């Protein structure tokens, strides 16, 4: 299959095909069996076959592969969906529980000064007031290319359901990010700054009497999306929060209340000031239909967050490109700033603490075709059960072509009780040490490799393994 318009783009954008037929012939010869979404390039193939420019056998091959997939899927014997099977798969208690669990496990705790988890008083005791503020507080943001579930739970609704009558909840939108949230709309208009500043004043008034603030900010589906055409853009020149969201945070921070920021977004944001001044930060990404309940589960300690960042979060757009497995370079740094990211790849905190020890190897020397077992001790040094993800990285000390400074080769998320220690074992096979050499061959070169382990890509302990010498 081709991506949408990829075949016609050979003519329209990349200028490597003179006509639709030219693009179609090249795609067919490369093994592409279907032209999506309109088929406007492959529509030329019938005439090309009749006139001898494309062999009919090439069409037969593509059709045979497509029909084989349909046969394997049983679509000829039973081409219709089974409504009863569909009902068992989605929109039921089991599916909603799975969505909630997925959201719970996806959240990444970036900062916590002890503000989290929130404690609730006993029934009948004095009630705290929690201000739930922000443009992503009362809406469930599902991201791009999403289905439309019958029921979604916002952060506001999840918190209300969790606290019941044991806390007072006040809400204010704070700001609008965009004029509307329609992901499909071509035009994106930012909300009016003057109107937003009026909303900020309302949020400050609502939060003034609160004991703590939950601030849900980040993206809408419009500000973090695929830009699939010149009239449907998605890229931005900045990683800063869109619109007046930073102003909203600053105004709430001036109240002197503990602030927990919940980020709902589709890409990393540059939040240096918030990272410094917020009391707690949760990176949620897009949490799905049960996201509001899952956020409440984490805020009130029913679930101990254990997610890890799948990307590096830079301090500013000027640090880009920024990724953990960069190549060695002469990049020396910046005037007035650091090359260190705001949060490294693989980072994530917990309501407990862990100690990830130095790795040990089953052998310090192995042949080129050999494997090694890496054992990493991890101990829960805190007072409650929690998850830690042990990560193993490899670095080739000297190689014939430049390689990344570290490459993630294995990881495992483990749940440990307070005080529990576990040895987490990984087997690294020859594939873990392979590289493409200057002859474009996938090989293992003899030499020393650093085997590094830790809780994230920036805090690693290393041992040396000799391969093939």
Question: Where does each model-flagged region fall?
Answer:
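Membrane-targeting and insertion segments and their boundary/processing signals
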Residues: 33, 40, 73-76, 80, ...
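Short acidic/histidine-rich active-site segments
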Residues: 1-13, 17-18, 26-28, 32-39
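An acidic, carboxylate-rich microenvironment
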Residues: 22, 58, 418-420
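Helix-enriched interaction subdomains in cytosolic or periplasmic regions
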Residues: 57, 71, 77-108
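Short coil/turn segments at secondary-structure boundaries
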Residues: 39-41, 61-62, 77-84, 118-120, ...
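Long, well-ordered, tryptophan-enriched scaffold segments
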Residues: 31, 38-77
